[in-house]
Amino acid sequence: MGAISLAACGNQSGNDVDNSSQAQSSTSAAASSSETTSKKKEADLSVDQSMGGGAAVWQFPVFFSGWKFGQLDQPGAMQLTNDKGGQYTATQSAYPSPPAPGDRAATQEQTDKWIQDIQAKTTGMQHKTADSTEITASGQPVQMMRTDAEYVGADGQNYRAVVWIRAFTQGTKPGFVSLTYATPTSSFSEEELKGMLEQTKLMNIESSQLNM
């Protein structure tokens, strides 16, 4: 299966996380080692400014069984579609001006906008939102907000959608990203979604935690 970065084509090598630590002779030394390892893991979520100027970017699959790749008429967006009406979409956007610090509040704001947009285009929408760590970067989980939604589309069909959203208000280049899997309810597949997520990663993540 192939994959492409939304910011630049080609291979992108990341740093492997080093979980090893030397044995310590005291409890205080062991605590210090644990803290160092924790910081090392966070540091491994490094930034490559050649991609998106250092903004968070997606590594997105260009091939997946039963799906075809298409470039959306929207900067920083890519999509896979299938013959059943399914869409798998990744987007990334930079803030036009520095936002107020606070990833959680900014992520909630973008999530609310997504919900309002779907509600405006559909009927009977039901949804729930919770924190999620299913998306990874450099092998480490990235805390995001996941919304599961059900609604009736303009075509009268029942649909299910899952969207992951995360805002990054600080760091090299603040912005926000989203990943959406939406299909008619009859063709929604948890197994298929899991396979697609395994090929979809975030890069240029400086902080994985969804802090206040």
Predicted regions mapped to residue ranges:
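N-terminal targeting sequences that direct proteins away from the cytosol to non-cytosolic compartments
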Residues: 1-82, 183-212
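Second-shell loop/turn segments in exported
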Residues: 97-105, 131, 182-187
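Short, solvent-exposed recognition patches
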Residues: 100-125
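Active-site beta-strand termini and strand-to-loop segments that position acidic
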Residues: 80-84, 147-150, 168-171
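Long, low-complexity hydrophobic alpha-helices enriched in A/L/V/I and glycine
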Residues: 159-167, 173-177, 200
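Short, well-ordered beta-strand elements
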Residues: 92, 174-184
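Signature of long, low-cysteine stretches enriched in small and polar/charged residues
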Residues: 116-167
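A short acidic-to-branched-hydrophobic micro-motif
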Residues: 81-109
